[in-house]
């Protein structure tokens, strides 16, 4: 149990670190851009892009910054917001997409995330055009009570620019 929870939290931390790698480039955050490279396709939306909503434990989250969607090698990487407060998800490129991992960042002192195969939490995804709905239960550790895992329901609705 402790090992699986540690793996889940480590996965969330890795995802959070990955967001910082995706957040470079458009520092002003005021213009939308689209680019492609040899490893896949990257799509960016301007801050406050329509269609983005994140809910954790029934509460809307204030997530600001760009939406970056990258499709490479059969995997969709979605990053919302900046490195410090961002949300990230990794999905398969199938229909329906399978959730590989989700990083929700720090919510009220608890770093929340989901990683498939750990036995901790759950997540499903659906796709409608360029819009994704990712929902489930993320897990984390409250450092005030590290022996008691924290589970929070979440839902992410995001649209990737075509």
From Swiss-Prot:
Q: Per the record, GO CC terms?
A: plasma membrane
Query: What InterPro entries would the database entry show?
Result: LpqH (IPR008691)
Q: Which UniProt keywords apply?
A: Cell membrane, Lipoprotein, Membrane, Palmitate, Signal, Transport, Virulence
Its biological purpose: Might be involved in ligand transport. A host TLR2 agonist, modifies host gene expression in response to pathogen.
The gene is lpqH
Q: Where is the lipid attached (S-diacylglycerol cysteine)?
A: 22
Q: Where does this protein reside within or beyond the cell? A: Cell membrane
Using the record, list the residue span of the signal peptide; answer none if the entry has no such feature. 1-21
Q: Which residues form a coiled coil?
A: none
Instruction: Please state which protein family the record places this protein in.
Output: Belongs to the mycobacterial 19 kDa antigen family.
The membrane-topology field of this record reads: Lipid-anchor
Bias-annotated ranges (Low complexity): 28-42
Region of interest (Disordered), residue spans = 24-53
Provide the domain comment: Forms a U-shaped beta-half-barrel with a large hydrophobic cavity.
Q: How is it modified after translation?
A: Modified by Lgt on Cys-22 with an S-linked diacylglycerol with a mixture of C16, C18 and C19 fatty acids, signal peptide is removed by LspA, modifed by Lnt with an amide-linked mixture of C16 and C19 fatty acids.
- Listed Pfam families: Myco_19_kDa
Q: What name does the UniProt record give this protein? A: Lipoprotein LpqH
Keyword Lipoprotein in record = yes
């Amino acid at each position: 149990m402790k090992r699986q929870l540690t793996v889940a939290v480590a996965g969330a931390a890795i995802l959070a670190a990955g967001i910082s790698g995706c957040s470079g480039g458009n520092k002003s955050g005021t213009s939308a851009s689209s680019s492609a490279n040899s490893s896949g396709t990257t799509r960016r939306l301007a801050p406050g892009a329509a269609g983005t909503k994140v809910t954790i434990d029934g509460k809307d989250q204030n997530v600001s910054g760009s939406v970056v969607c990258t499709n490479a090698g059969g995997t969709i990487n979605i990053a919302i917001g900046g490195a410090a407060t961002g949300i990230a998800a990794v999905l398969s490129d199938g229909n329906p997409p399978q959730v590989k991992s989700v990083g929700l960042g720090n919510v009220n002192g608890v770093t929340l995330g989901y990683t498939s195969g750990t036995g901790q939490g759950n997540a499903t995804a659906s796709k409608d055009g360029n819009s994704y709905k990712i929902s489930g239960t993320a897990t984390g550790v409250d450092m005030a009570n590290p022996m008691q895992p924290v589970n929070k329901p979440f839902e992410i609705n995001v649209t990737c620019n075509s």
